[in-house]
């Protein structure tokens, strides 16, 4: 039997000291030494020099004590590391264990069983006696909380099959085995999840208390650019998250950043306005570089610009201590959080939209819709238009009314007033000389051209049509198109001559043009449009509308055929004024036209030749820019009281 533990018993422990003391006791009859006095009191004065208190000896003792303490700490650390290493390999299967076949279920059950085991044969499955703390690598965290059972079953062919069954352990044991590195494991689980977006949305709603989709609108394409972006970034290091608030400022005009802890690390919610438009891929790449987080761990979408709830959330959290805000607040947040704007946006006025389209010379529905929608940030009526469910109806009504007003305005003007009105819409800075130089280059006498142009603009019978004749590449179309563009004339194409409505544009224009007339076109003119070339009233068929009778506007033609030289059209010779362009149009070495003809040059040309063209301006039109009825207004004006 082994000696019992403790201090009781003879000859063991501290009792040995007392045996020695009894041996040296005085016996009867012993002679007492002269230098020993029994009656003397022991004061300990004879032990004064027994302890050496010199400095060197004390320092040596302290060093030895420190070394012993350091050694004890190292032993404890090594034991802990060894224990964790054993725990790591003990949690795996036999195939993954470095011990190979020597690792058995008995070893997992208790470390002491290995010392008394005679062999490592297969035994029946037993329960785990106790659980060992996690190694910290995360790979065996779940296994430590489960009970593993190995079952040997006989297969049909006589062999044995090893199967493992596991059941969940106690949740309190799992809470004790939490390790600081578990966030890395859970972040890996996020990366390996089948639906990463759903997992991130669930965690976001659990942390912030609202859905991420309540704050953003969805961009299906990653290439769509936007200046404002809302992002939720998962698994950010706390130190990096603090530095992100400073690093993002140089690239943004506005930054609203919130940081909260989640099971994957720090969860950052940010609303950023960049200095220039970026797409989702560019934003994700930049954030991944700054935060060292994979792009798959980010939710990036543009914010809801018309949601009062979303704007109120950014406003309320921006003034609280949970957020870090820098820069000027976006205008859409200011607009949606001001009560007065919210009241004004609820009322849409169609006349306001019609007035805007009329002032900007817009009659196309697509242009109206696009440009008016861009005013929603600064125009309350445009914002109400976007909120309406009848945008298509309002847009169609606006385009129809604008065309009616434009058509009536044009009909009220004569040619002089219309040219004056068009000149008022063109900027200054033109030069009339390139037009005159180009005519001289083509051999056209300038005085003859002015005389024909004066009769052309007045619509004089037999002088209502001008033909620019010449070979190809002589600048006929360039000269004619620039003239029509300045006067906002209409273009008719003979390709549509099979339709009854191909002349319908003549009803709403002051001047028209047909480019590149062919033999077929001249034959059609000779058969059906002699009175139109004369400048007499004609009847035009319009689609879904009754026939319209009007005086045909002046028509400018370009062609490679001179009808006056062909005997097939003898009746067109007196109705067409011909100017020949025989020379090729010149270009400089850079490919630019030598004679630049644009709206500014035509404005300067008409201002220079105003009197020669017999264009008159009434005194009452001098203050109204040529418009006989002044500035058009279709909105309710405000009454003004004189001082």
Swiss-Prot record:
Entry PTM: Phosphorylated. Sumoylated.
Which EC class, in a word?
A: isomerase
Q: What SUPFAM superfamilies does the record tag this protein with?
A: Origin of replication-binding domain, RBD-like, P-loop containing nucleoside triphosphate hydrolases
Residues that, per the record, bind ATP: 470-477
Renumbered to this chain, region (Disordered) spans 152-178
A UniProt-annotated Pfam family: PPV_E1_DBD
Q: Name one GO molecular function term.
A: DNA binding
Which keywords label this protein?
ATP-binding, DNA replication, DNA-binding, Early protein, Helicase, Host nucleus, Hydrolase, Isomerase, Isopeptide bond, Nucleotide-binding, Phosphoprotein, Ubl conjugation
Cross-link named Glycyl lysine isopeptide (Lys-Gly) (interchain with G-Cter in SUMO), sites = 551
Q: Where is the composition biased (Polar residues)?
A: 152-175
Which GO CC terms are listed, alphabetically? host cell nucleus
Q: Does the keyword Methyltransferase apply?
A: no
Q: Which residues carry this modification: Phosphoserine?
A: 110
The catalytic activity of this protein is classed by the Enzyme Commission as 5.6.2.4
DNA-binding region: annotated segments: 179-345
Instruction: Give the family, as the similarity comment puts it.
Output: Belongs to the papillomaviridae E1 protein family.
How this chain assembles, per its entry, is: Can form hexamers. Interacts with E2 protein; this interaction increases E1 DNA binding specificity. Interacts with host DNA polymerase subunit POLA2. Interacts with host single stranded DNA-binding protein RPA1. Interacts with host TOP1; this interaction stimulates the enzymatic activity of TOP1.
User: Which protein are we looking at?
Assistant: Replication protein E1
């Amino acid at each position: 039997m082994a000696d019992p533990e403790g201090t009781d018993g003879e000859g063991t422990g501290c009792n040995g000291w007392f045996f020695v003391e009894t041996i040296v006791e005085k016996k009867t009859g012993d002679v007492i030494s002269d230098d020993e006095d029994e009656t003397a009191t022991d004061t300990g004065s004879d032990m004064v020099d027994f302890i050496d208190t010199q400095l060197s000896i004390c320092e040596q003792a302290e060093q030895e004590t420190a070394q012993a303490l350091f050694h004890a700490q190292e032993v404890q650390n090594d034991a802990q590391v060894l224990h964790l290493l054993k725990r790591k390999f003990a949690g795996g299967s036999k195939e993954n264990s470095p011990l190979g076949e020597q690792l058995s279920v008995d070893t997992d059950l208790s470390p002491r069983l290995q010392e008394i085991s005679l062999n490592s044969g297969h035994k029946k499955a037993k329960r785990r006696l106790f659980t060992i703390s996690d190694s910290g690598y995360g790979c065996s965290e779940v296994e430590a909380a489960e009970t593993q059972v190995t079952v040997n079953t006989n297969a049909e062919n006589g062999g044995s099959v090893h199967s493992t069954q596991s059941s969940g352990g106690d949740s309190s044991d799992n809470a004790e085995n939490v390790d600081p590195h578990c966030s890395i494991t859970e972040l890996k689980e996020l990366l390996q999840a089948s639906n990463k977006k759903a997992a991130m949305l669930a965690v976001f709603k659990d942390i912030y208390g609202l859905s991420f989709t309540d704050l953003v609108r969805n961009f299906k394409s990653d290439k769509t650019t936007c200046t404002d972006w809302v992002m939720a970034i998962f698994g950010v290091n706390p130190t990096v998250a603090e530095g992100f608030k400073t690093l993002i400022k140089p690239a943004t005009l506005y930054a609203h950043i919130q940081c909260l802890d989640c099971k994957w690390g720090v969860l950052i919610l940010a609303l950023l306005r960049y200095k220039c438009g970026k797409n989702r891929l560019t934003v994700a790449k930049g954030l991944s570089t700054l935060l060292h987080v994979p792009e798959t761990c980010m939710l990036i979408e543009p914010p809801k610009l018309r949601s009062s709830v979303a704007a109120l959330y950014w406003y309320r959290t921006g003034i609280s201590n949970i957020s870090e805000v820098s820069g000027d607040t976006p205008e859409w947040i200011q607009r949606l959080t001001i009560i007065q704007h919210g009241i004004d946006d609820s009322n849409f006025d169609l006349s306001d939209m019609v007035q805007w389209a009329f002032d900007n010379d817009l009659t196309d529905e697509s242009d109206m819709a696009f440009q008016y929608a861009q005013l929603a940030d600064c125009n309350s009526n445009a914002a109400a238009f976007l909120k309406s469910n009848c945008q298509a109806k309002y847009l169609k009504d606006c385009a129809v009314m604008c065309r009616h007003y434009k058509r009536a305005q044009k009909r009220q003007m004569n040619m002089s007033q219309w040219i004056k009105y068009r000149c008022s819409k063109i900027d200054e800075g033109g030069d009339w000389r390139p037009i005159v130089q180009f005519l001289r280059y083509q051999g056209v006498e300038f005085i003859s051209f002015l005389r024909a142009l004066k009769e052309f603009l007045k619509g004089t019978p037999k002088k209502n049509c001008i033909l620019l004749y010449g070979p190809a590449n002589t600048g006929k179309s360039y000269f004619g198109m620039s003239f029509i563009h300045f006067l906002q004339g209409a273009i008719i194409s003979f390709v549509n001559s099979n339709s009854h409505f191909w002349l319908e544009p003549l009803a709403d224009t002051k001047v028209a043009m047909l480019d590149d007339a062919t033999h077929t076109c001249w034959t059609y003119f000779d058969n059906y449009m002699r009175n139109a070339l004369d400048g007499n009233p004609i009847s035009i068929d319009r689609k879904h509308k009754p026939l319209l009778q009007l005086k045909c506007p002046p028509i400018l033609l370009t062609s490679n055929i001179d009808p006056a030289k062909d005997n097939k059209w003898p009746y067109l010779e007196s109705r067409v004024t011909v100017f020949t362009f025989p020379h090729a149009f010149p270009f400089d070495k850079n490919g630019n036209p030598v004679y630049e003809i644009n709206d500014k040059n035509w404005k300067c040309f008409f201002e220079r030749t105003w009197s020669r063209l017999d264009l008159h301006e009434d005194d009452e039109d001098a203050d109204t820019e040529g418009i006989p009825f002044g500035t058009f207004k279709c909105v309710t004006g405000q009454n003004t009281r004189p001082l």
